Amino acid sequence: MVSVIPLTGLPEVQPGDDLAALLGDAVDRAGGLEDGDVLVVAQKVVSKAEGRVEQTDDLVAAILREARAVRRRRGDLVIAETQHGFVCASAGVDRSNAPREGWIVLLPEDPDASAARIRTGLGERFGRGPAVIVSDSFGRAWRQGTTDVAIGVAGMQPLLDLRGERDARGYELSSTVIAVADELAGAAELVMGKANGVPAAIVRGYAAPPGDGSARELVMPPERDLFP
């Protein structure tokens, strides 16, 4: 059975904080780690710990600076491709949950590396490093609402490739590749939320595909993009 355990009691994260240590304290309060656990951490606390915050009066200028390319724009609404290759609103730049009024939060420079540092820190503390996902909220074309997705991954493969396997009726699967890291991020978001003050959660009971994958594997290759 899969369960999702919120990690509570984390203080307001500041630039330079040892995020792995803060998360480790929260893990202790939640009863520790088990083999196979997946830790999902909200991007905002990762960015704050890494100093990816700044004061600005010009949000659009910050968005354009963080963007590799602008895909669509309508007034102040900008859908942009980030330097990482993610396509999202505002290039991931956000005022919500910023340290103070007039400040913004940027995406981590390398979310995979951020996840790996957390995994290493927890591994040193607990003797086992859980798979780690750094998550952020993305909108989806042609669908209302947002859902959390993985922008950084360590200690697991983000995709589960079922091509070549057979379904319950014996048909061979020809195109089924499941974005398990995104699904785990979405599951964790149910107990984290944007206003609950819970920036991390453990997903327990799911056998994540082992390996050293990257969240960039979740980005659609340009040659397969039908909506460039």
Question: Which positions does each model-derived feature cover?
Answer:
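A structural signal for small-residue-enriched, beta-sheet-centric alpha/beta enzyme cores
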Residues: 3-10, 43-48, 53-99, 126-228
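Intrinsically disordered, low-complexity linker/loop segments enriched in Gly/Pro
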Residues: 90-117, 121
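Electropositive phosphate-/nucleotide-binding environments in soluble metabolic enzymes
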Residues: 13, 17-21, 108-112, 116, ...
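Phosphate-interacting basic helix/loop segments used at nucleotide- and nucleic-acid interfaces
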Residues: 17-30, 109-130
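N-terminal glycine-/serine-/threonine-rich phosphate-binding loop
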Residues: 1-37
